[in-house]
Amino acid sequence: MLLLKASAICGKGNEGKRNKKGGFTLIELTVVLAIMAIILMVIAPNFSYVKDSAKAKVDKQNCAAIERSVEMLLAEDAISSSVTNIKITSSNGNVQISGISDDTGKSKLQDLLEDLDKPQSGDSYNVDIENGRKVTVSIV
């Protein structure tokens, strides 16, 4: 009897029991992966919204910069008040301007807009001038 108790205390007699090692089971890993997949499915559409929103904001800022530049050149009479429409195209860092016949006004506007990027949502910027004062910029 005394031998049995000693073997139980020393851990002998447990040969039939499974020796457990630390780690995760396949079910636990599967559950974690499923939860991560669900989280990604919820978050992914928000990333595309943020990207589209950023593009729209860049276009809006570029339009505002063009508007201020044209208004300034109109105030300086570098652009004639008879000009009613200007088309601005930017590609590979080159800004092309059509609708201004005066080379001085055209070159001043090109200098002001030298860092202008191509619009994110179109091909070019369209500048409408009403009564030689009111400037409206849109993307075409």
Curated annotation (Swiss-Prot):
Q: Which UniProt keywords apply?
A: Membrane, Methylation, Transmembrane, Transmembrane helix
Q: Which residues cross the membrane?
A: 24-44
- In the record, N-methylphenylalanine modifications are located at 24
Q: How does it sit in the membrane?
A: Single-pass membrane protein
Gene Ontology CC: membrane
Show the propeptide residue ranges: 1-23
Recorded superkingdom: Bacteria
Task: Tell me which NCBIfam families the record gives.
Answer: IV_pilin_GFxxxE
State the protein's name. Prepilin peptidase-dependent protein A
Q: Which organism is it from?
A: Clostridium perfringens (strain 13 / Type A)
